[in-house]
Amino acid sequence: MTSVDQLTKKCPYCGKMLLTLPGLLAQEEMGDSEQNALRGLEIVCTCEQSIYAERKLQAEIEASRRSTEAKEKAERTARRMAASNMPETWHRRGLSSWLRRTPNEQLAYDSAVAFGKRIQAGEHPSLYIAGPIGTGKTMLASCLALDLIRSGKSVLWSNVGDLLRSLRATFSSKEQNEEFVIDHFAQASILVLDDLGKERPTEWAAEQLFAIFNRRYDYGKPTIITTNYSGADLIKRLTPKPDMSGYADDTTARAIVDRLRGTASTIILEGESKR
């Protein structure tokens, strides 16, 4: 049988004797009828010093929990950054660093912030960022993409030229084929393609681009595009060169732009080159 000594503990602060009976949710303090709160099976004295110590302990536990969560969040963010294919030198960017010196730059900022909020709300919009060379299209897209990564979203970044080169590389690869590369880009949670139209595609390349955009359109996946060209000019730019008879088939180019613009909001950047 358990002795009384084994069922008592002494408050280290005030010296009161506390009776501990396993299984009780609360226990009277020995010597009076004051109730004591239990943490598990451990009685906590209600003296001022004990309450202060308990609160301090709980604060330390909470601080440790928050520190662990912050560390784990930073590690997850770092992994998403690495998987995004974005240059490490960009990783400090964010929309807060986007300069808003002109009404156009402010409008671009507001539109990018609104797009990010739609993504966070669970929507699946796309974004079309156009403007002359040097007006900040890549900067704006990268700032937005990095903010999305920090918020917990997975992003895949690629220059369109690099995408096409990765597709061409499958010609001599035994490990990857076109379908593997297309699916890699088509399945990305959020895809950012930089400089669409800079490289005029062949008929084959245009078909591969359409396959990616069409699947993303069908899957409802957000896509962010930067380009120097407006809709009509982009169609011309994505149309393969004319054949021997002088005929240029723009069917695929029109289909690409249709898929891009179907669910996309538009940001038009203006002004002189910042480079």
Predicted regions and their residues:
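Short glycine-rich substrate-engagement loop in P-loop NTPases that contacts/grips substrate
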Residues: 106-112, 146-187, 200, 207
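Conserved catalytic network of the ASCE P-loop NTPase/AAA+ motor domain
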Residues: 119-122, 148, 183-186, 214-219, ...
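A short, basic N-terminal segment
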Residues: 1-101
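Loop/turn-to-beta-strand initiation segments
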Residues: 125, 153-154, 187-190, 219-225
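N-terminal pre-Walker A segment at the start of P-loop NTPase domains
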Residues: 95-122
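Walker A/P-loop nucleotide-binding motif
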Residues: 121-141
